[in-house]
Structure formats: C-alpha cells, structure tokens
C-alpha cells in the first residue's frame, strides 16, 4: 500500500464567517454544503482535493486536533496580489512575498492563526 495523493483538507474554526471570507477572497470557490449529518459547512474541490471549512463549538475544534500545527499552501497566479488581499483582510504577516529558488512565495496566518503559504512556481 502507498499514498497516491491527497483527498481532503478540513479546517475547523470558531470564526466561520471570517474564515470563509478569508479563503473566498484568496479565490477558493467555497459553497455552502449540508449533508444532513453534522453542521452546515463550506467546501470546494481544488485539483481533485476536497477543501472544507467547518464551524466548531468551543472545545470541539481543539478536541479534533492532536495538538500539532496545520499549514495550508496554495498555488496562486500572483503571490503579491494574493498577499495584498490577505493583508487587507487582517491576515498576520509571517513573511512578505519573496523570490525563492523554485519561484515566489509569502506566508501569512488565517483568522485562526494557521500558517497559509501563497506560492507561484513558473512553469
């Protein structure tokens, strides 16, 4: 058996509205979903990977985590524009856009403090 790819990235948040606006502003086409079992949440597919944001009650989101840190990374067409949008939404800057050996990148924190890397790798 081997891992052949990612199937899902699920974020739990107590700041659902703020987190939804943040990721939608970065270009994720998140739409409301309700499967009848569990909370209404927002989701989309990015390159075949299910990305979802779920609301979590106080303590619920923490109990679903093992205590580690989750970092999300997105390929974007324009790192500087994505960074500016994130900053306008109040994202905390970890490091500003910079050229890397493989392309351009920036790192910010989403409304819950998770690191979000914005990348562009020229083809």
What are the language-model segments listed below?
Residues 13-16, 37-38:
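Conserved beta-strand-loop-alpha-helix junction that forms the acyl-donor binding cleft
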Residues 10:
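Polyanion-binding surface elements
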Residues 19-24, 86, 113:
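Conserved active-site tyrosine of GNAT-family acetyltransferases
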Residues 15-17, 77-79:
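Helix N-cap motif at beta-to-alpha junctions
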Residues 1-7, 26-74, 81-109, 120-123:
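Vicinal oxygen chelate
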């Amino acid at each position: 058996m081997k891992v052949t790819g990612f199937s899902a990235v699920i974020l739990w948040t107590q700041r659902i509205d703020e987190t939804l606006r943040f990721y939608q502003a970065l270009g994720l086409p998140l739409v409301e979903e309700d499967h009848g079992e569990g909370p209404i949440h927002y989701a989309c597919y990015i390159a075949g990977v299910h990305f979802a944001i779920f609301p979590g009650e106080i303590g619920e989101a923490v109990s679903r985590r093992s205590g580690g840190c989750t970092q999300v990374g997105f390929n974007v067409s324009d790192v500087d524009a994505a960074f500016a949008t994130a900053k306008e939404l109040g994202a905390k800057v970890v490091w500003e856009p910079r050229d890397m050996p493989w392309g351009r990148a920036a790192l910010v924190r989403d409304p819950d403090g998770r690191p979000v890397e914005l990348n562009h790798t020229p083809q």
